[in-house]
Amino acid sequence: MKSIRNMNLAELAAYICTHLMNNGIKCILTGGACISIYSENKYESFDVDFIDNSFTSKKKIAGILEEINFTESNRYFSNPETEYIVEFPSGPLSIGSQAVKEIKEIELSTGTLFIISPTDSFKDRFAAYF
């Protein structure tokens, strides 16, 4: 397994997503990180935003993320081996007032990533500006 220090954004997101899923928590990547992944970093984001579709307590998520050396400070989780910051915005998974219906599944060497579609990613970024 690749060390966190050597993971790109997609690999790190898949690693976190899989670690959470192995603990019964299904999270979907949303926000700017999706655009970074779909655009091959032509748009760069250092926030890894997951929506927790399992409605798990923040305390439980924090405990699970501690297992992979992520510590919580305010609403963010960080790991000294990476510049990416992880956050869990409140759900439900939606773009504006519309529910997200299409979730993509991307297999990487570090795990499985559940991510909103390219179209919903664009709509999400566009909605964030208005």
Provide a role label for each language-model segment.
Residues M1-F130:
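Compositionally biased terminal segments of proteins
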